[in-house]
Amino acid sequence: MTILNHTLGFPRVGLKRELKKAQESYWAGNSTQEELLNVGRELRARHWQQQQQAGVDLVPVGDFAWYDHVLTTSLLLGNVPERHQNADGSIDIDTLFRIGRGRAPTGKPAAAAEMTKWFNTNYHYMVPEFQQGQQFKLGWTQLLDEVDEALALGHKIKPVLLGPITYLWLGKVKGEQFDRLSLLNDILPVYQQVLAELAKRGIEWVQIDEPALVLELPQEWLDAYQPAYQALQGQVKLLLTTYFDSIGHNIDTIRALPVQGLHVDVVAGHDDLAVLNKNLPKEWLLSLGVINGRNVWRADLSSWFERLQPLVNSRPLWLGSSCSLLHSPIDLNEETRLDAEVKSWFAFALQKCAELALLTQALNAPNDAKLAELAAYSAPIRARRSSSRVHNAQVEQRLAAITSQDIERQLPYEARAETQRKRFNLPAWPTTTIGSFPQTTEIRGLRLDFKQGRLDGKNYRTGISEHIKHAIAEQERLGLDVLVHGEAERNDMVEYFGEHLDGFVFTQNGWVQSYGSRCVKPPVIIGDISRPEAITVEWAKYAQSLTEKPVKGMLTGPVTILCWSFPREDVSRETIAKQIALALRDEVEDLEKAGIGIIQIDEPALREGLPLRRADWQAYLQWAVDAFKLNAAVAQNDTQIHTHMCYCEFNDIMDSIAALDADVITIETSRSDMELLESFEDFAYPNEIGPGVYDIHSPNVPSVEWIEALLRKAAQRIPAERLWVNPDCGLKTRGWPETRQALANMVLAAQRLREEQV
C-alpha cells in the first residue's frame, strides 16, 4: 500500500505578510474589496503550488481564512450575530470583518465577537455566539469556491472543515442560557449539504477537524459524536482529525464512529502507535502527524523512519503535519542573517512539507540511498545535542543546586507588608500604572534607527533618556504614587528580554498569525539560558534618580517568556522556565542594589500555559509557580514584588495565584465590572490587589464617577487597605491625550476615596 502525505493547513499570511497589508489597506479605505480578494486568490494559488512543489501529495483547501477559520465556519453555517447582520440577510466579507473587529468599510459598527486562545496555542479564534432557537443555513460558500479554484489549477486536494461538535464546544451562549449541544441537529443539515456539494465535485477525502476529542469532554458531548457522524457518513470519505494532544482516553468513542480514517498528533500526543494501530478498525486509514506544525525545529527523519517502518503494510497509512502549519513561519530560506549552524537546526512550513515528502518516499521504497538521505538530513539536529551553543555547564549546575529555600521569601506576607509600609509610606488607595506608556512614532523611529545603524549608542541612550524623563514628569504632574519608567526602550515584552539573554535567537521573517491581521515573531530558545549582564537596571536607576517617589522595576516573568517563544524540544518546559527564572533572579538582585524597592514581574501567560487536560494541570501549576517564586524570592523583605495578570478566569487556579506570594497583584477587571474579584473574595486572597479600573484597549476616557463606583464595588469584596488603583493593562497602544485624561480621572477618584477616610 502506497503511503501518501498531506498537511493539515498552511500559513495564510504570506511570506511578506501580504494578507495583513491587504486587510489593513482595505479597512483603512485605501484599496477596494476586489483588490483584497485578488490578494487572497494569489496567496492561495501560491501556497498550493509551493506545497505541491515541495512534494505534498494532497494539499489542504479551506484552511485559508480572511480573519479566522472558526469565524469562517460560523459564516458557512449562517451563524451571524444580529448586531452584525446586513439588512437584507446576505453575508459578505464585511459581515465577517464586523464580527472580527467590530467595524468594516460597510455596515454599522457593533461590538466585535469575543476572541480567545485556540486550544493551547498562541493563535486566537473568534468565539461563535449561540441563541436558543436560532436558524442555520449554508450562508457563505468560501470553502466551495476555493475548492473550485484549486481543482481548476489541477491540484490533488483534501478539503478541510471544522467538525460540528468541536464548533459547538468552542462557542458561547448569549442571552437566555440553554445547552448549546442541543443545536447539533440544527447545524448537521448544513454540514450534509456541504459534503454533498464536495461529493459532486469528485472529492474523495474530507479532513473534518475534531480537536475537542483530545479534551476531557463531558459524557453527553462524547455521546453526541455517534449520531452526528451517522448523519454525515456516505457522501465522501471522512478523515476524523485530532491534534494538540493524545486521544487514548476517548478511543472507545472514536473507534465506534462511521468514518473512514483518523489523524492523530504523534508529536504532542503520547499514544502508543502499536496499541493505537491494533485498536482501530482494520479498514480505517491512519494518518500520523509526525512533523511538528507548532515549532521550528528540523525533524529527525531517521528516528521517525525507525519508529514508523513496523506499521507499513499493516493498514492504509498517511503521513502529515501534527497540526496545521498555521503556527509555523513560512520559509527558512528567507533567513539570511541566522548563523549557519543554528539555521541548520530549523525547518519552517515549506521545509516541513519537504520533510514529509522525504520521509514518505523512504517508507514507500526503502533503499540504501534513501536511508543515507534521511541520515544526512537528520545529521544537524543530532549534532545539536552536543553543541556548545546548546549546553552551558554553569547553568545546568546552578539549576541542579536549587533548594526549597531558594523559592521562599524570608518572611511571610504579613510581616513583609509591615516593613514595606514603613519603607514607602504610601497613602490609602495608592495609584500606579501597569508599566508601559504610549509608544509614539518618535519612540519607534528612535529604536529602528538604532537597530539599523543610523543612530549610534550614545545618541540612542540620550533619546531614550528624554522619553523616560518625559514619562516621569507626566506621572509627577498627574499625582501618581508609584511610578514607572514607561518602557520606551522595549519593542515587545518578550523579545526585549530574549535579546539580552544567552540561549535565544531571533528571525527576520519568522512571522506567525496571532489573530486577524496581527502577526507575531516569537524568539526561538535554542539552548541553556543565562544573563550575561544586567538588562533593565540602567533605565530603572535613571528613572528613580528623577523622582523622590518609588519607581517600579519591570520584568517579564519566566512562564510568559517561555509561552511566547518557540521552545527547545530536548528539555522540559519546566527546565526552560527555571533557567529563565534564575537569569531574572539575578536581575531582581541587581535592581535592589540600584535602589529599586518595587519590582513587577509580569505573568500574563501563566494561565494560558495550562495543559489541555485538567488531569495534567497540577504538575504544570506546581513548576510554573515555583519558577515565579525562584525569580522573586531573592528579594529582601522590604522590597515589594508586584505581578500583573490579564485573564478572564481565576476561579480554577486561585490556589496557584495565592501560592505565587506576590505582595501585590494587578488584574484586568474593568470589562467584567469587577466580577472577577469574586474569585479573590471567595478564596479570601490574603495579599494586596490592584483591580484594573479602566479598559486600556478602548480609547474611551472613563469618568471620575465611573472609576469611583468601580472602586467602591471592589471595596465591598476586598478590604480597602489592601486595594491599589490602576488601569487594567499597559498603555503602550494608547495616545498621550487620552492617557493623561484617564489617569487624571483615576487619581482624582482615589483622592476622593481617601478624603472620605480622613
Curated annotation (Swiss-Prot):
Please write the reaction equations for the catalytic activity of this protein.
5-methyltetrahydropteroyltri-L-glutamate + L-homocysteine = tetrahydropteroyltri-L-glutamate + L-methionine
> Which residues make up the binding site for L-homocysteine?
434-436, 487, 602
- Gene label: metE
| Cofactor binding remark | Binds 1 zinc ion per subunit.
Residues given in the record as 5-methyltetrahydropteroyltri-L-glutamate binding sites = 17-20, 117, 518-519, 564, 608
Species this chain originates from = Yersinia pestis (strain Pestoides F)
Protein's UniProt name: 5-methyltetrahydropteroyltriglutamate--homocysteine methyltransferase
Q: Where does L-methionine bind?
A: 434-436, 487, 602
Q: Which cofactors? A: Zn(2+)
SUPFAM superfamilies in UniProt: UROD/MetE-like (SSF51726)
The record's Gene Ontology biological-process terms are:
methionine biosynthetic process; methylation
